[in-house]
From Swiss-Prot:
Keyword Nucleus in annotation: no
UniProt KW keywords: Chaperone, Cytoplasm
GO function terms (MF aspect): ATP binding; metal ion binding; protein folding chaperone; protein-folding chaperone binding; unfolded protein binding
Complexes and interactors: Heptamer of 7 subunits arranged in a ring. Interacts with the chaperonin GroEL.
PROSITE patterns associated with the record: CHAPERONINS_CPN10
Family: Belongs to the GroES chaperonin family.
Described function: Together with the chaperonin GroEL, plays an essential role in assisting protein folding. The GroEL-GroES system forms a nano-cage that allows encapsulation of the non-native substrate proteins and provides a physical environment optimized to promote and accelerate protein folding. GroES binds to the apical surface of the GroEL ring, thereby capping the opening of the GroEL channel.
Gene name for this UniProt entry: groES3
Keyword Nucleotidyltransferase: no
Entries under InterPro entries matching the protein: Chaperonin_GroES, Chaperonin_GroES_sf, Chaprnonin_Cpn10_CS, GroES-like_sf
One GO cellular component term noted in the UniProt record for this chain: cytoplasm
CDD domains reported for this sequence: cpn10 (cd00320)
Protein name, entry field: Co-chaperonin GroES 3
Classification of source organism: Bacteria, Pseudomonadati, Pseudomonadota, Alphaproteobacteria, Hyphomicrobiales
Subcellular location(s) of the protein: Cytoplasm
């Protein structure tokens, strides 16, 4: 997993989805076609922040390396160097894990 050379603008972040287990606690293997897309990911790049009404730059609350939860339909899917990534606004992030 090479570091992305994509730098998001403003209050956007680049997220790599964290895959869920493909086997249940009871040992049943879940096929890829039945799995939902994970709503958990790791931030790999952050923008510089948004500007407030006075024009002052407000930095983001998240940083590269944070594990986050986001909505099922959040972000825009992009493929970069063969890797599926999401670009989303900080407002689409529901929380930081850990």
């Amino acid at each position: 997993m090479a570091q992305s050379n994509l730098r998001p603008l403003h209050d956007r972040v680049v997220v790599r989805r964290v895959e869920s287990e493909s086997k249940t606690a009871g040992g049943i293997i879940i096929p890829d076609t039945a799995k939902e897309k994970p709503q958990e990911g790791e931030i790999i790049a952050v923008g510089s922040g948004a500007r407030d009404e006075a024009g002052k730059l407000v930095p983001l609350d998240v940083k590269a390396g944070d594990r986050i939860l986001f909505g099922k339909w959040s972000g825009t899917e992009v493929k970069l160097n063969g890797e599926d990534l999401l670009i989303m606004k900080e407002a689409d992030i529901m929380g930081i894990i850990g």
